[in-house]
Every structure is written in C-alpha cells, then in structure tokens.
Amino acid sequence: MRPDRPRDPVTGPDEGPESPYPIRMSGPVIKGFGRGSKELGIPTANIPADELSQHPELSVGVYYGVVALDPARFSTGETVLPAVLSIGYNPFYKNESKSIEIHIMPPLSAPSPTATTSTDGQVTFHKLPDFYGTPLNLLILGYIRPEYDYISSEALIEDIRVDCEVARRSLQRPAYRCYLDARAVEDPACGGDDCGIVVDAIDGGAMRGMRFCI
C-alpha cells in the first residue's frame, strides 16, 4: 500500500544522474493491456520487457527519463520528450507478467502541469496518437518510487499525476535538461564533450545523429 506521507518534489542528485543511470533501452511500441487509456485516461507506450534481463539493477517501480521517437514516422514538433515509466506487475491490476509502460509527456516548454484537474475532480492527461510498431529509444535517468497497490483507481491516478510532476521538475534541472536536446549542440550543463551522439541507430538509421548525454 502507498505510504501516507508527502512526496519529494524532485528525485535524483542535482549534479546529474548517478550510477547505474542513464540506462538505455529500445524497442518497438507494442500493444499492452489496454487499460491505460481506456480505464485510467493515461495513454502509455509499451515496449517489450525482454531487455530487463540485461538490467538486474532495475527493480520494479516508477522511473523517469526521456524517449526519442523516430522523426521519420512520428511528428510531434519535438522528437525527444520527457517520460514517466512503470516497470513491474502493477499490483492494482495483479498482472502476472512484467511490463514496461511508458507515459510520454509534453515538452518541458509546454505549460505545466502535465495533467489537469477539472472542477468535478476529473484528471486529464496529455495524449499522443497511437503509434504501435514505431521504434522507440528510452533513456532512464532516475528512480521515483516503488510500485504500490491502491484502494481505488482514483488513488492510482492521483499518484501517477504526482509522478509526472516529480519527473517534470526533476528534468528541468540543468544537469538533466540537456538529455532532452536532440540537436547537435553541446550543452555545458551536461559536461561539454561528455554529450555524445547515440550510435545505435534504429529503423535503417532514421535516428542516427540524435544527441544524448552519456
């Protein structure tokens, strides 16, 4: 069950990601359980969980990072976007298989908050078009919290809303913000020459030249 205490507003050291982060994963967007959008109103992009066997350091829980979308297939104005992701079994739904569910957020330049709450208490999250099959590169930059069971879907939705704001504030710090820069420009906040080009191109090289800090 979720602890009844205030949440930290940011997570991870201000100086930037510390070991084992950043962790890179990739894969095509696949169909998940279909509950994120339909039942919770929180669209997610699922990628295969196969790579988790290569990352024993990733325990079940909620993380934040950035995703790089293939600009040849997906146009949002920006192709590197902040993200919150869940790795695990989602105790509320009692899943039997481990999954990677990624909620892609608006650019940091977009007005906060990521999710809005109406006068009647309805929470609405940022939505993106369906893009099943689209290659997706994921860079995990930090850990937010363990996964919890919940007494209601409303409690789950509220925690995800807070997760999004924690991720957003965490990524707004200079040592993290540069991970969202896909342009071939060095950012001193990322350590200058330590900002390197992603060499593992996907989809025939469509992502070649996307710049992440490593």
Swiss-Prot record:
Secretion signal span: none
One Pfam family cited in the UniProt record for this chain: Flavokinase
Residues that, per the record, bind Mg(2+): 44, 46
Name listed for the protein in its UniProt record: Riboflavin kinase
EC number: 2.7.1.26
InterPro entries in alphabetical order: Riboflavin_kinase (IPR023468), Riboflavin_kinase_bac/euk (IPR015865), Riboflavin_kinase_dom_sf (IPR023465)
Record has Secreted as a keyword: no
